[in-house]
Regions:
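Short beta-strand segments enriched for Tyr within beta-sheet-rich domains
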Residues: 175-183
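Phosphate/ribose-recognition catalytic cores of enzymes acting on nucleotide-derived substrates
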Residues: 183-197
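A short local structural element in Rossmann-fold oxidoreductases
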Residues: 99, 180, 191
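RNA pseudouridine synthases
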Residues: 3-4, 11-166, 170, 183-186
Length: 197
């Protein structure tokens, strides 16, 4: 039997790494002016109350309001498991204007994701998706571009090694869990996705 000392956590984690948010974790405000606030949303916290997320103890919108002392409104959403920049508006009119820009695809969204396997260097998933409680699937499109690949010489299941790729993901629509579901559809599951992976 081999015993190991507990691993020390690096004081400088990798860029984009977010440990689970707790009630005392400060929010990182990336930008703020009289009309907008941009928050670095960590993975693991729901943006707002909804029937899809159940009854969490806290929500990012409440934390942002408490941290800034301002009434703020969501301009868009990010899934609980997703980290990234979240835009908040200082009033309802600004939130509506930003929401329109997202709906009209005037805002370009880019994500990074590590997937299992090596997909083609670039591609497009054009596959309709439905949402819980909504009638029928709606059009959904996601473009991807492969940035890097790696192979790990550790057997898993029937495979003698594991292959992974880093992708740039650009959703052209904004459907429920679109990126995770589209990656599942092309059999290159997002690493860490416990629902579709």
């Amino acid at each position: 039997m081999v015993s190991r000392a507990p691993r020390e956590h690096s004081p400088n984690p990798a860029p984009g790494y977010h440990p689970k948010m707790t009630a005392t974790t400060p929010l990182a405000v990336l930008y703020a002016d009289e009309a907008l606030v941009a928050i670095d949303k960590p993975a693991g916290i729901a943006v707002h109350r909804s029937r899809l997320v159940g009854h969490d103890e806290e929500y990012l919108i409440d934390r942002a309001r408490a941290a800034t002392g301002r009434t703020l409104y969501l301009a868009h959403r990010l899934d609980r498991a997703t980290s990234g920049v979240l835009l908040l508006a200082a009033d309802r009119d600004m939130a509506a204007a930003l929401g329109q820009q997202f709906m009209q695809h005037a805002v370009h969204k880019t994500y990074l994701g590590v997937v299992r396997g090596w997909p083609e260097p670039e591609g497009l998933v054009d596959y309709p998706l439905d949402a819980p409680g909504k009638p029928g699937p709606k059009p959904a499109r996601t473009r991807w571009r492969r940035l890097a690949t790696t192979e790990v010489a550790i057997p898993m299941g029937r495979y003698p090694q594991q292959r992974y790729a880093l992708l740039v993901l650009e959703p052209e629509t904004g459907r429920y869990q679109q990126l995770r579901r589209h990656l599942h559809h092309i059999s290159h599951h997002l690493v860490g996705d416990t629902t579709h992976g």
